[in-house]
Every structure is written in structure tokens, then in C-alpha cells.
């Protein structure tokens, strides 16, 4: 199987590359696959992804646990998953967008990963100060 990098919620911001599959809920220039991340299962084969990028997507979804389950289903063992969300500790960032359904904290992910048996994860926390 030719494993790819899947960019979820790509919009039109990601350059074309033969190893990258850009996914979004809306069709448009720069979108390779159109589907709704809230509709499970996704039209991606088990283990098809060597890497999945989900930047500022989870806070918009109805069921983040089902989203996480699908991430693990499509990522082959040893693959990488990158998730970025606004931190719930920053109230303005977490809730300034009216389409945000819920905020997240680092412990949200650590608890989920422990339940599914992932024990060591590199994490990066960054914030902006003005």
C-alpha cells in the first residue's frame, strides 16, 4: 500500500504534493477528497496514512472521541498524528469562534491516549503573548 500524508480540514492552504491528500468538507481548489469528518467511517482505508495532520479541526466536531478513533484506524502502526487545537485555558482563543463546539486541554488527549494504550507521546505547547 502506498501510504500518504492526510491533511484534514485543509481548505486551500496546502500546496499540492504527490504524497499529500488534502481533505475538506467543501470542494474547492486544492482539495483532493471531500467528506464530513463527523460522518464515520471516513472514506480512507485502514492504515492508509503514514501521517495525519489535524490543525484546528477537533474544536468544530460533534464527537471528538469518534474522530480520534478514526485517526487511529487510518494511521498505520508507527505512523504519526499531529493535532492542534486552541487551549481551553485561553478563554478568548477557545471560544472566540462561534463554530467552536468545545475547548480542549492537554490532559484531554493524554487521558484518551492512555485508554487506547499509547503511553508515551511527545507534546508541544505554544502560546502567543502580546
Model-derived segments and spans:
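S-adenosyl-L-methionine-dependent methyltransferase catalytic module, highlighting the catalytic core
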Residues: 65-72, 76, 80-130
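Conserved SAM-binding loop
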Residues: 3-90
Amino acid at each position: 500500500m502506498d501510504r500518504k500524508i492526510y491533511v484534514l480540514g485543509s481548505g486551500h492552504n496546502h500546496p499540492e504534493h504527490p504524497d499529500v491528500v488534502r481533505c475538506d468538507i467543501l470542494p474547492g481548489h486544492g482539495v483532493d477528497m471531500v467528506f464530513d469528518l463527523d460522518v464515520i467511517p471516513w472514506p480512507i482505508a485502514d492504515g492508509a496514512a503514514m501521517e495525519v495532520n489535524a490543525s484546528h479541526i477537533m474544536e468544530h466536531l460533534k464527537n471528538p472521541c469518534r474522530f480520534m478513533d478514526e485517526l487511529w484506524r487510518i494511521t498505520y502502526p508507527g505512523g504519526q498524528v499531529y493535532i492542534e487545537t486552541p487551549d481551553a485555558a485561553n478563554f478568548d482563543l477557545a471560544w472566540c469562534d462561534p463554530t467552536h463546539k468545545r475547548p480542549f486541554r492537554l490532559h484531554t488527549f493524554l487521558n484518551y491516549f492512555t485508554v487506547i494504550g499509547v503511553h508515551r507521546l511527545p507534546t508541544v505547547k505554544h502560546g502567543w503573548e502580546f
